[in-house]
Amino acid sequence: SLAFVEKVGYPVIVKPDNGVGATTTYKLKSEDELRAFHEEDFHGVQFIMEEFVPGEIYSYDAIMNSKGEPIFETGNHTPISIMDSVNNHDDSVFYIEKHIADDVRAAGRAAVKSFGVKSRFVHFEFFRLTEDHDYLGKKGKIIGLEVNYRPSGGFTPDMINYACSTDVYKDWADMVAFDRLTKEEYPDKYYCVSAGC
């Protein structure tokens, strides 16, 4: 791990290879913190180490048909670090974006194409850089973070339903059964935000 830190510098992120959310994820800012991490007993859990990326998280959430085309698209924005919220026991905040930014949509669709995704609900996460980075790019650039072949977790599908005036459970079933939406008209609900511990 010291060789990796010498290459990318501090801070670094360490997280379980098979983790959920930001549980047991750490931002190490010094050699002392790195040594303390290595002295902990994590009961055989394997960790991966990543370079810290300064950014806010945006997601691309979509239902893809059998041709790999989106039949429904939305996303969310997490302006406060989930890792900091978990580790500091702070509140977390995110909101559904009814109309996702063009660059997030383009990145999501490019990932779908690259991975050959068909007939799936996807939840892809991206960083939007909050500052210039030597080799990742300029502030505002979209950088890939995570690929999931499933809906976003927790109550997010219900938030999507509210924010987008839809029923993603029915939309997902429509994709499986008919490869298209058999959309009903739902009353407009407009927006949905989550704030909590």
Can you name each region flagged by the protein language model?
Residues R150-D171:
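ATP-dependent carboxylate-activation loops
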Residues R109, K170-A173:
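Non-transmembrane alpha-helical segments in soluble domains
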Residues S1-P54, N65-E69, V93-A106:
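Active-site nucleotide/adenylate-binding loops and adjacent lid/helix of ATP-dependent enzymes
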Residues E6, K113, Y162:
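Short polybasic/polar patches that bind polyanions
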